[in-house]
Swiss-Prot record:
<dbReference type="InterPro" id="IPR013785">
    <property type="entry name" value="Aldolase_TIM"/>
</dbReference>
<protein>
    <recommendedName>
        <fullName>Tryptophan synthase alpha chain</fullName>
        <ecNumber>4.2.1.20</ecNumber>
    </recommendedName>
</protein>
<dbReference type="GO" id="GO:0005829">
    <property type="term" value="C:cytosol"/>
</dbReference>
<comment type="similarity">
    <text>Belongs to the TrpA family.</text>
</comment>
<dbReference type="InterPro" id="IPR002028">
    <property type="entry name" value="Trp_synthase_suA"/>
</dbReference>
<dbReference type="InterPro" id="IPR011060">
    <property type="entry name" value="RibuloseP-bd_barrel"/>
</dbReference>
<keyword id="KW-0822">Tryptophan biosynthesis</keyword>
<keyword id="KW-0057">Aromatic amino acid biosynthesis</keyword>
<comment type="subunit">
    <text>Tetramer of two alpha and two beta chains.</text>
</comment>
<comment type="function">
    <text>The alpha subunit is responsible for the aldol cleavage of indoleglycerol phosphate to indole and glyceraldehyde 3-phosphate.</text>
</comment>
<dbReference type="GO" id="GO:0004834">
    <property type="term" value="F:tryptophan synthase activity"/>
</dbReference>
<feature type="active site" description="Proton acceptor">
    <location>
        <position position="46"/>
    </location>
</feature>
<dbReference type="InterPro" id="IPR018204">
    <property type="entry name" value="Trp_synthase_alpha_AS"/>
</dbReference>
<keyword id="KW-0028">Amino-acid biosynthesis</keyword>
<dbReference type="Pfam" id="PF00290">
    <property type="entry name" value="Trp_syntA"/>
</dbReference>
<comment type="pathway">
    <text>Amino-acid biosynthesis; L-tryptophan biosynthesis; L-tryptophan from chorismate: step 5/5.</text>
</comment>
<feature type="active site" description="Proton acceptor">
    <location>
        <position position="35"/>
    </location>
</feature>
């Protein structure tokens, strides 16, 4: 991940596993990383859009094993890095090491466990290191300097910067606080920093990359398209159009930094 990238998020199994695979292949053209969310019944960090996607997936009796199967199929055609996003409860119930091994075998490059605080992640980090599984931790605008450094060191793939306070979901604009946070993280962190929560258009990507981010993470905007168009050719067209717009915004922001 040298040039800034688009990190595209999808909920696995929304609206069905075959559609997820098609969506991944479509977004792959413009994405430097794909973040695949494993649906969970209580996704506390996610806004209404992604919560609804989780419900759609789980209502079809979608299981974690199916996420691994989808990823295995994707791996037959692409080596684009894939980060699996989930919550601690499903990982704990499966057994941390068992989960990490299965994710690795499926072709995952890294994991985000949204509700696992860094201070409680010692065992998890050891297991990930043992099996060469990447880790991504999150930081918010009010994260203290020392905590930011530790989170950066613990994140082998990139540090996930939460652009604002609250839950995920598309928004119109970003506050100066977000730009200041990126600049602070850019100064403090040695690893890659990617910004998520609320990004839905090319102009957003452009402004965030211009401030120094290594990538933008887009989820709700893609999931909204899937909600509206389902498993259809039109959904694929709309997803590709948005991914292209975001990718072009990233390129513009990067040019402004040079």
């Amino acid at each position: 991940m040298n040039k800034p990238v688009l990190v595209s998020f999808l909920v696995s199994g929304d609206p069905n596993p075959d559609a997820t695979l098609k969506f991944m292949k479509t977004l792959d053209k413009y994405s430097g990383v794909i973040e695949l969310g494993i649906p969970f019944s209580d996704p506390v960090a996610d806004g209404p859009t992604i919560q609804a996607a989780d419900v759609r997936s789980l209502s079809n009796n979608f299981k974690i094993a199916k996420s691994f199967e989808v990823l295995k199929e994707f791996r037959k055609e692409s080596d684009t890095p894939v980060i699996l996003m989930t919550y601690y409860n499903p990982v704990y119930k499966r057994g941390i090491e068992n989960f990490v091994i299965q994710a690795k075998e499926a072709g995952a490059n890294g994991l985000i466990i949204v509700d696992l605080p860094l201070q409680e992640a010692t065992e998890y980090r050891k297991i990930c290191k043992k099996h060469e599984m990447g880790t991504v931790f999150l930081a918010a605008p009010n994260t203290p300097e020392e905590r930011l450094k530790i989170s950066d060191e613990a994140s082998t793939e990139f540090l996930y910067l939460i652009s604002t306070f609250g839950i995920t979901g598309a928004r119109d604009t970003f506050e100066q606080m977000t730009f200041d946070f990126i600049k602070r993280a850019r100064t403090t962190c040695k690893g890659k920093i990617c910004v998520g929560f609320g990004i839905s258009k090319g102009s957003h990507a452009e402004s965030l990359i211009e401030q120094g981010a290594d990538g933008v993470i887009v989820g709700s905007a893609f999931v909204d398209i899937i909600k509206n168009y389902g498993d259809s050719k039109e959904a694929l067209v709309k997803l590709e159009e948005l991914a292209k717009e975001l990718s072009e915004g990233i390129d513009k922001g990067y040019e402004k930094r040079k």
